[in-house]
Amino acid sequence: MRKAITILCILFSFNVYSQCVGPQSSTISPLGPYQPGDVVTVNYTLSSFSQVNVNWIHAFELDLGSGWMQNTIVASGNPGNIGGSSGYWLWDNQHTFPSGLNFGPGWRFVHGVVANWGTVSTGPFSISVTMTVKQTCNPEDLHIGVIVYGDCQTGGWNNGACCSDPAYSVYQGNVQPTPITTSNINHY
């Protein structure tokens, strides 16, 4: 009986915490910790997206700490649209979706037929970004996360419960500022 309850709890928690988003992975180069001016490349892959309630994948948003220079983000390629809907992926620094979701920076899908719908593609999807650590004397937050949105969350589709998947954590850390060294002061 305990085994059955344990299995049910595991299945329930998987369903609650990962409704649409399948396996995710990432690499980061170079490995941290980071100092001001360091340039970092992140590669992220979402292996699959389950279309619960015909909820199509719509966007990949970067969740970044305050220690990153937002104006240095360079996106490479796009997430891909294997067997997907007509349309294209657009890199966007800021966009407000019909649901009121303030989005950016990240990739969002621009559907070729129906505005504000995602793509029917189930993946895999890969993104790559390069960014620079801010010049600072403080240990500012350098977390990096990726949030995946379906068109139900962005307001383009309404067919029952939306997927509510947590952000995927790529990196947790703070800027490691180089200590300022000064010579001894001589009062003679």
Language model region names:
Residues 132-169:
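Serine/threonine-enriched low-complexity regions used as flexible
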Residues 36-84:
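Low-complexity, serine/threonine/proline/glycine-rich extracellular segments that form mucin-like
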Residues 4-6, 178-188:
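Enriched but not universal
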Residues 31-39, 120-124, 188:
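Solvent-exposed, conformationally flexible loop/turn segments
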Residues 19-55, 167-181:
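Serine/threonine-rich, low-complexity linker/repeat segments that form flexible spacers/stalks
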Residues 1-25:
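Bacterial Sec-dependent N-terminal signal peptides
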Residues 66-110:
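A surface/secretory-pathway sequence property marking extracellular, secreted
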